[in-house]
Amino acid sequence: SVEMIETEGLQIHRYEKKSFWISGGDERNFIDPHLWLDPWNAIRMVQRISQELTEADPESAGRYQENSKFLQQKLKRLDQHLEQDLDTLKQKPFAVFHPAYTYLEKRFDLMRVGVVNIHPERPPGARHLAKLRRMMQQNGIECLFREPQFEPRLTDMLLQGTKVRSAVLD
């Protein structure tokens, strides 16, 4: 098996230690695992996978390298496309249900200012939700992004009586 986190050249982002997904005191548990959401990280990961497959199966090296090159080109085009499409959104604050998009946000200078559910195993408390609601109003947040696998009831309740829209990010 290959540990992608050890791939040379990756941009690595860490959670705050007081945040979540902490177990056993292992420093690696503070690393945000959503590495691929930065297209340049994804490119480095594709290169690493191709390299590992080539070493394990040299007879198929040409096919691995060809597939790697093709996917890297697609990821570079995706990066350019996202850079253009997200450029107008750089100064627009938003909130997310779950803090899974840090790599995307940092790569494209997006302005996340709030998170509904910080810990995946525990629902947020009333104090956190009240604070988030005030922050959304004070910062002029227009959109809260949620994910399809999470029940929308919590975000619907949070946004009730506000002008903040909800959209699904998948």
Where does each model-flagged region fall?
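Extracytoplasmic metal-acquisition and chelation regions
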Residues: 1-170
